[in-house]
């Protein structure tokens, strides 16, 4: 590799040298470098190994689309795997290591997988080990279960640190009139226009510098500085750098993650590592830009192959000339500016253009710099192992290619078109449409206060990007209620802006020659994998995605999805629009779990709660876990049982005989008053007016937006009194919700709600022998008959020992079951009584793990479905 740092140029500070470590070797860079640029400057070619074949991977881009250079940052508990070297800011003392390789990324023993690549094609784990001919040895899943352990152990990229995360994280909320995502020329122009109108603007940029594409253009410093000066002088504009908008949600809500201290070795102790922002904006403008595409050709994953934009950015932003003999493969106009910049920096540049001809202005640019243009040409194969050394070229068009010679090079830059970043607007259900003229998907429609501008809407010229931003701000201001400038006139800008039309180019393949061309670089999905999926019937884009894992790596298919869709459309004999595209889901880029969790870790000042049976449970072998703020039995191990063995035994015993479970932590609310029935009718999705006294009813409670908030049973004790149970975690939330409704919306209702959770202790008695156990425990056995105590019935009586009790015949397991409640002081006595009888029937105690299993097998709602993200569509409409 022959990359070198230039003496001048770029947005780095050469007076501030930074020391860092790469795979144990001490290297240096400058303030303003990314880890990727610093590695390039130090001539580090192989940065990573691929997921499946362990092929060498180098730096392929300069931004969030990077799917090759994934590294691990930090040591010990601070280790962070799968970090893009292209987006990691360099800082003094940074420690970075390669991953998914042994003993190192330069010499990886697992690269032998590449030799057996024909046996590791798409879906191999479904077929290869499912029986070995001729005797079908291992037919079925038995032997697969053994292979699976090996496969899963070898799968993955970086290794997650098992120690507790020592970093802290925060949650924050904010509001604004206009949220602008992206601070390139379009985003900056939009912020200025909106700020001048007096709008409260939040400008979000994932990079550490404002400017976007302007940072990679050598003659744009004046424009960039002017735009930034106007923004910084306007107090209406809030700037958030190092902040990624990873998702858009209902009602103008956006999820942002601010990387507060990821760029320093030793942060201030009071600062979090990352901050998760929930922003509610009246209007949103997406100036998210576009990503450059690769081409599928033989060995297109070799180190030394990257996008043309990356080559230009490393030159003009970081002052690095990434090669001396540079080939640029393109099918569009944008690569010519890159070629000119590289040539001026001293490189010998050759343009390999798939088109028959280009505009005179482009020819003049090339001629002025002595750049050779090879028309109707494209790369067929990259030559070289650890780094590209030469190209085999092909001539032709429209899928008909013939070998045409070779070209020596130490760097190949690829520009096969641009894909507007429409991910965020797609989160709101807007499906992008195919623009044939520009060979890309664009969002042709705005959605409820969300607009795309600039190259995110398919505009390639800076002036057009800025004009589209002004138009969008005008429309946003009108929607908010502000009066825009009278002189502005809204026009519709059509995607495009190049002088010469693009020549769609996705794959270069010569029928008579074997090739291994990659579509998804991170997951090692090849073009042949896509064709295999087609032959095996996985022709829907969603099936293609899951069968081949195309686009399922942590880059989300930013570099390879379009190529995969094009290959599938070719196999189907359809146009790309007919094949469609997958739906983008948040997050746009990976988000640290810690950022989503925030401070909801470890113990807080809120007191931990224990049921009245806590000591009793421990004495009987319970292993405890946390459910909300409650300590609850997780499982009851016998001898040396593992949790897996224990919960299976507990569930099986409950199904066949009887099981006892401490359910005291369930929320319990007394609903009393003349209008108690009317209140229940309003807060539950199912009616309660006709519920007889002495009966219980299961109900679903929804939030205002139709999302499930809680479920539980409510028992009618008298004409004006009910006993409501809620889930453990949502008990306080449900009570607060009911109190809010009674104070603000339904203050006319004569109802009083009171938490009685600590007054009552509860035990679930489940299984076919549950009635026999209770019949032996109550003073009046006749009350337990099927006739006297029907399903969903509620009875009050006495347990032996004159213990007052309240019993309901309720099942959350599918078997006959009851819930027994007594005053909390009687809890240990109740458990002794029930347990002694359960043992007679070979029953057992069971914990939360078995309880969850029983609920799932029954088809009941589980905690995972009550997390505030699920609608009423839970197969519970019938209730």
Q: Which residues does each predicted region cover?
A:
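Residues forming the flavin
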Residues: 1-25, 29-610, 759, 873
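Adenylate-forming
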Residues: 311, 878-879
């Amino acid at each position: 590799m022959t990359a070198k740092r230039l003496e001048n140029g770029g947005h780095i500070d050469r007076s501030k040298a930074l020391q860092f470590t790469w795979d144990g070797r001490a290297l240096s860079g400058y303030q303003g470098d990314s880890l990727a640029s610093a590695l390039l400057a130090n001539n580090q070619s192989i940065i990573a190994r691929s997921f499946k074949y362990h092929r060498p991977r180098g730096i392929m881009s300069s931004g969030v689309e990077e799917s090759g250079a994934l590294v691990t940052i930090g040591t010990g508990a601070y280790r962070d795997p799968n970090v893009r070297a292209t987006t990691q800011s360099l800082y003094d003392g940074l420690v970075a290591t390669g991953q998914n390789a042994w003993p190192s990324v330069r010499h990886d023993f697992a690269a032998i997988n590449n030799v057996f690549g024909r046996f590791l094609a798409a879906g191999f784990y479904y077929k290869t080990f499912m029986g070995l001919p001729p005797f079908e040895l291992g037919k079925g899943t038995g032997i697969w279960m053994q292979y699976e352990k090996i496969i899963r152990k070898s799968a993955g990229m970086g290794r997650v640190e098992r120690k507790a995360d020592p970093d802290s994280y925060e949650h924050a909320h904010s509001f604004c009139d206009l949220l602008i995502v992206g601070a390139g020329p379009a985003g900056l122009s939009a912020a200025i226009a909106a700020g001048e109108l007096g709008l409260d603007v939040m400008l979000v940029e994932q990079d550490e510098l404002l400017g976007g594409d302007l940072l990679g253009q050598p003659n744009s410093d004046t424009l960039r500085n002017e735009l930034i000066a106007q923004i910084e002088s306007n107090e209406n504009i809030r700037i958030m750098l190092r902040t990624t908008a990873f998702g858009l949600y209902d009602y103008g809500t956006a999820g942002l993650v601010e990387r507060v201290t990821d760029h320093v070795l030793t942060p201030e102790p009071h600062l979090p590592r990352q901050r998760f922002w929930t922003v509610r904006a009246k209007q949103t403008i997406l100036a998210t830009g576009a990503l450059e595409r690769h081409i599928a050709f033989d060995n297109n994953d070799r180190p030394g192959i990257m996008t043309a934009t990356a080559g230009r950015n490393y030159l003009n932003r970081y002052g690095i000339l990434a090669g001396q003999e540079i080939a640029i493969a393109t099918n569009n106009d944008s690569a010519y500016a890159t070629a000119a910049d590289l040539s001026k920096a001293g490189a010998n540049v050759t343009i390999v253009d798939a088109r028959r001809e280009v505009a005179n202005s482009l020819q003049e640019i090339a001629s002025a710099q002595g750049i050779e243009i090879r028309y109707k040409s494209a790369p067929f194969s990259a030559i070289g192992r650890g780094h590209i050394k030469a190209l085999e070229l092909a001539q032709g068009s429209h899928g008909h290619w013939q070998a045409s010679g070779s070209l020596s090079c130490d760097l190949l830059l690829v520009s096969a078109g641009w894909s507007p970043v429409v991910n965020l607007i797609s989160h709101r259900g807007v499906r992008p449409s195919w623009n044939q003229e520009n060979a890309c998907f664009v969002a042709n429609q705005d959605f409820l206060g969300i607009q795309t501008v600039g190259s995110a809407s398919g505009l390639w010229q800076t002036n057009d990007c800025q004009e589209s931003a002004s138009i969008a701000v005008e429309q946003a201001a009108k929607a908010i209620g502000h009066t825009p400038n009278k002189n502005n006139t809204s026009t519709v800008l059509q995607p495009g802006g190049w002088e010469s039309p693009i020549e769609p180019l996705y794959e270069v393949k010569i029928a008579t020659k074997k090739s291994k061309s990659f579509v998804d670089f991170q997951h090692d999905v090849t073009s042949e994998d896509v064709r295999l999926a087609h032959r095996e019937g996985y022709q829907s884009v969603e099936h293609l995605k899951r069968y081949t894992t195309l686009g399922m790596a942590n880059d989300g298919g930013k570099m390879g999805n379009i190529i995969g869709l094009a290959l599938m459309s070719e196999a189907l004999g359809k146009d790309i629009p007919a094949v469609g595209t997958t739906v983008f889901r948040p997050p746009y880029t990976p988000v640290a779990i810690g950022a989503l969790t925030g401070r909801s870790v470890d113990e807080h000042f809120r007191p931990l709660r224990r049921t009245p049976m806590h000591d009793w449970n421990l004495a009987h072998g319970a292993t405890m876990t946390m459910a909300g703020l409650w300590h609850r039995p997780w499982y009851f191990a016998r001898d040396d049982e593992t949790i897996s063995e224990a919960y299976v035994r507990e569930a099986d015993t409950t199904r066949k005989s009887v099981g006892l479970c401490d359910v005291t932590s369930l929320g319990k609310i007394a609903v009393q008053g003349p209008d108690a029935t009317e209140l229940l009718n309003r807060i539950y999705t199912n009616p309660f007016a006709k519920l007889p006294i002495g009966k219980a009813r299961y109900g679903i409670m929804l939030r205002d937006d139709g999302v499930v908030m809680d479920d539980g049973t409510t028992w009618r004790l008298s004409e004006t009194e009910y006993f409501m149970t809620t889930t453990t975690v949502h008990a306080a939330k449900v009570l607060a919700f009911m109190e809010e409704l009674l104070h603000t919306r339904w203050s006319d209702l004569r109802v009083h709600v009171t938490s009685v959770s600590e007054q009552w202790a509860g035990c679930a008695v489940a299984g076919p022998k549950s009635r026999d156990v209770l019949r032996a425990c109550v003073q009046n056995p006749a009350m337990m008959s099927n006739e006297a105590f029907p399903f969903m019935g509620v009875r009050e009586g006495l347990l032996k020992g004159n213990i007052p009790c309240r019993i309901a015949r309720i099942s959350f397991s599918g078997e006959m079951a009851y819930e027994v409640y007594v005053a909390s002081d009687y809890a240990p006595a109740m458990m002794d009584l029930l347990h002694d009888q359960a043992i007679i029937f070979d029953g057992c105690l069971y914990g939360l793990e078995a309880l969850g299993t029983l609920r799932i097998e029954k088809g009941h709602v589980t905690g995972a479905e009550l997390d505030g993200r699920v609608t009423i569509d839970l197969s519970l409409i019938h209730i």
